Amino acid sequence: MKSPCRAAAGWLVLLLSSCCLGYVIATEWAAAVTTDNGILFFDSNWRKISSAAHQYSRISAFAYDEVLGKLYFADLDHPEYRLFALDYDDTDELHKVTKLLPKSAQTAYISGMAFDHLERRLYWTEKGTRSVYYVAIDELLSSTRSAAAAANGTAAAAATAVEATTSAPPPSSSSPVQLVATVQPDHELAGLAIDECRRHLYWTNCYPKTSNIVRAAMNGTVLNVHEEQVYLPKGITVDHYRNRLYWVEKKYGRRYTIESADLEVNDQRTLQTGLDRLPADIAVKNDYIYWTDQENNEIYEMSKEPNAPSRTVYRGEHPSAVILRANLLLEHQRNNPDCRSVVDRILENMQNSKPASVLQQETQQQGQLTVCLNNGTVNHHTNTCLCQPAFGGKLCEIDLCNNYCAQGSCRIGRDNRPRCDCDRRYEGDRCDRNRCDGFCLNGGRCQFSNGTAGRTEEEMGDRTCLCESTGYSGARCENPICGTDYCYNGECYVEEGKRPKCRCKAGYRGERCEEYSCNNYCLNGGHCTLGNETTVPECECGEEFAGQRCEIAVRLCSTYNEDPQWQQYCLGISKTLPLMEPKVTYCKESFNRTVVYTSLCFTVSFALLLAVVLVVSRMMKPPRPRITKKMVVTPMTSRPPTTQCEITIENCCNMNVCETPCFDTKLLKKSKKEDKQFLLEDIEDVGGSYRKLPNCGDGTAERK
C-alpha cells in the first residue's frame, strides 16, 4: 500500500505535468495547408502558428498519420525525390523532413493521397501511369532510418537548414510500391479518399469527357462508378460523422459546385454553387466543410447543410490542399458502430508496435512512464493519450459531461462530443437558456402547460403567452388589438374582454368613428351645424318642417293637433299655424325622356326593317333577259335575192320597247329556264318569231 505522502507526491507530479503541458496544448495545430511556400499550420481559430517545409514549392498532395503524428506529402519540383514525411513538433522550430521515395514512373505526378491506419499503408494516385499505388509506411520508415543511421554513422548529425532532412537510401531492385488499380486511357486521376471503417477506396476522374466518381475495394476492384451530373471533380473526402462523401467540381465556364453523396455514391446533393472559383481540395470536421480556392487564393468554411453561406478563414499563398487535425478516427469514432471494431484493432496494433525507446524506458524506468487517466490509451509514438468516450484532455483527466449541461442530462454523441437533453423549460446547446425568455412580446407573461419533465425535439408547443392588459393578442402577443387604423377619427382603447373601443373626436360617431355626425342627420332639407360648446348636431329647418331633426311636417300638426298620437310629436309647435299645402315645383324645360327614347328607338327600328325589305325584294326580282349573240337571217332558197330580208340584232339595249323583238313583257312572267328554252327554239326555227315581224326597210320586201 502506498503511503499518503507518496500518493500526494504522485498527484503533485501529475498536476505539474498538466500545467507544463498547457503551453503545448495551446499551440497544437488544428489545420495544415499546403502552399507554394511550404506547409502552414493553424490553430482552431485559423490563426497561423507555424510553418515548415519551406524548400518545397510545389506540394501536390499530403496525408496525416494520427498514430505517428506524421504528415506525408508529395513535391513535384524536387529533382530526385517525390514522397516525403514531416515530423511536426509543437515545441521545436526544426521540423524534420524525411525523404521516402525517389522520383519514378510510379511517383512522377502524384495528384491525390490518403492514409489507411488499419493496414498502415499510404495510397496515392499518379496521373502519368493512370494508376493507384500504395506503400507499407512502417517498413519504408524503418528502412529509411536504418539506411540513414548507416550512412551518417550516428543519429546526432547537426542540421544545416531550418528543417533537418534525412535522406532515404537509393532505390533497390525490389520496389516497395505496390499497384492497386489502373484506369482507362481516357481517364485522369485526381483526388483520393479512404473509408477506413467500411474498407473502401474512392477516387475522382477529372477527364472532361469521362468525369466520374469511383468506389472500389481496398484491393482495387471497382464496385460502382457514378457519372451522372459529374464534371471535372477534384478533391474528395469521407465524412464519418454523417456517413457521406464530399467533393468539389469545376463546372462548365465560370461555375463551380460543392457536391455530396452517400457512401455508395448515390443520393447526390449540391450543397453550394457559384461563379469565379477554382476549388482544388476539401476537408470536413464536425458540422463544417473547408475547401480551397486557387482562383482567389482562399479557404472557405461552410455548414454541411445545402445553400449554407460560406466565410473566408484564410487568404494568402495559393493554397492547394488542406488537412484538419481532428483525430477523427482514433478519438471521435469510438462510438460509431461502423468504426468501433476498426478503431479497436488500430489501438491494439498501436500497443503492439511500441518504439524501441519506449521498450527500453519500460525496462529501466518503470513507474515514470506517461499515465493516461480514466482508462485512456497511451500512444507511445507521439507520447500522447487516446481517451475513452466521455473524457478528454492531455491525460484524459477531463470529464466532458462534468457541468456541461446547465439544466438537463448529458450524453456523448457518436463524434465523441457531449450532447445535452434539456428539461422542458430550457433549450440551447448546453440547456442554459430558459425557453420563456423573450418568447412573449409586448409585456406578455409566459407559462408552460402541464406535461412531463422530458421534452423531445418536436414538443415545442407547450408554452403559451398570457396577453391580459397588454393591448395585444396572438400566440406571442405580437398583434396589437388597437391597430393604427382601427379608429378613423378617434382614440382606440381596450375594454374588458379584450375588445377594442373608440373614443371619437368631436363631430364623429360610429363604432370606429367613421361617420361624420351631420351626415344624413337633418331630414327634409334641414341644415346641420355643430354646437360650439356641446358639439352636438343641430338642425335649422325650413318653414314646412320642425323638430330636432326636421322630421315633423308643420301642416300635419295643424290638422291633427287634437289627436293624442300626434301631440307627442307636435308639442311646442304653434297650433295657429295656417294649413299649408306642400309646394310642388316643376321644371319648365323638363321632358319625358322615356317617351322620347321609345319614339327614337321605334323610328330607327322601322327604318332598318324597311331597308332590309328593299334589299331582299331587289335580290329576289328576276333579271331582264339579255341576248348576247349576233343573229343573221339567211336567205331562203325559194326566194330571189332581191326579196330577201336580213335583220341584225346587235345591241337591243339601244332600241325601245316597240322597236326591238328582244323584249316581250310576257317573258317577264316566265322563269329563266323557260325563257332560255324559248329563245333557242325560236332561233332554230327559221319561220319562228320572224313570221310575226313587220316588213323590213321601207315595206317593199315581203315575207313569202
UniProtKB/Swiss-Prot annotation:
Name of the protein in its database record: Protein cueball
Start-end of each LDL-receptor class B repeat: 69-119, 120-166, 199-242, 243-288
Record-level GO BP terms: oogenesis; spermatogenesis
GO CC, one annotated term: plasma membrane
Cytoplasmic side: 616-704
Segments forming domain EGF-like: 363-397, 432-478, 514-551
Record keywords: Cell membrane, Differentiation, Disulfide bond, EGF-like domain, Glycoprotein, Membrane, Oogenesis, Repeat, Signal, Spermatogenesis, Transmembrane, Transmembrane helix
InterPro entries the UniProt entry points to: 6-blade_b-propeller_TolB-like, Cueball_EGF_LRP_Nidogen, EGF-like_dom, LDLR_classB_rpt
Signal peptide start-end: 1-26
Membrane disposition: Single-pass type I membrane protein
Gene3D superfamilies reported in the protein's UniProt record: Laminin, TolB, C-terminal domain
Main localization of the protein described in the UniProt heading: membrane
UniProt record similarity statement: Belongs to the cueball family.
